[in-house]
Amino acid sequence: MNLLVTGAAGFIGSHFVLRHVANHPEDTIVVLDKLTYAADKSFLDPVEDAITFVEGDIADQALVTKLIEDHSIDTVVNFAAESHVDNSISDATPFLHTNVIGTQAIIEVIKEHPHVRLVHISTDEVY
């Protein structure tokens, strides 16, 4: 399996990557993360040799397309999200950009690559 895992430097995404690498070392994992306030790339240090890390935005359709095509991705697991409700009240823009526009961008790319599956992960913190 060739996975593109977005938001993998966040708490939940990083735990998914750590567990997946441990249980499926034969799989290819490409990580795409914007490294915003909720991310910590060091969460992925234990598996840094087993993954490809790309800093970038899920709303960048050209980047997502390139990663899917260059790495023969067959599954996108989307953990990317802005969370922390208090922050969204003071400025909703980054939340709309990532949680809505970013997710839409991934879906648009996948529509052009129908063999790619999407697993969308969310938490109560994005609402």
What is the meaning of each model-derived region?
Residues 1-127:
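N-terminal Rossmann-like NAD(P)+-binding domain of SDR-like oxidoreductases, especially those catalyzing
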